[in-house]
Amino acid sequence: MKLRPLHDRVVIRRSEEESKTAGGIVLPGSAAEKPNRGEVVAVGTGRILENGEVRALAVKVGDKVVFGPYSGSNTVKVDGEDLLVMAENEILAVIEG
């Protein structure tokens, strides 16, 4: 199954969770914080402006992004993989380099 987001929505594959702290303590699954980074796997057509024009999104498929801890509250399971669906404005930054 393929997921195609609408308008200014973006589908993100969350990065792998860290299971150890910086000090080397292993965290159980429920205690580990979910990472706020991921890779864009699909983008919508763009944001519809008040005048009816469509503004293209600033992110593209393959971009590595950072989003807020409460962003992407819509999780969808596609082919056994959990994907996040969020509005483009919930993305804080694109990781370059």
Curated annotation (Swiss-Prot):
CDD domains: cpn10 (cd00320). Its main location: cytoplasm. One of its GO terms (cellular component) is cytoplasm. Gene3D superfamilies: GroES chaperonin. GO terms for biological process: chaperone cofactor-dependent protein refolding. PROSITE patterns: CHAPERONINS_CPN10 (PS00681). SUPFAM superfamilies: GroES-like. The keyword Chaperone applies. It is found in: Cytoplasm. One of its GO terms (molecular function) is protein folding chaperone. It comes from the Bacteria. The keyword Acetylation does not apply. Keywords: Chaperone, Cytoplasm. Heptamer of 7 subunits arranged in a ring. Interacts with the chaperonin GroEL. Together with the chaperonin GroEL, plays an essential role in assisting protein folding. The GroEL-GroES system forms a nano-cage that allows encapsulation of the non-native substrate proteins and provides a physical environment optimized to promote and accelerate protein folding. GroES binds to the apical surface of the GroEL ring, thereby capping the opening of the GroEL channel. Belongs to the GroES chaperonin family. HAMAP family: CH10. This is Co-chaperonin GroES.
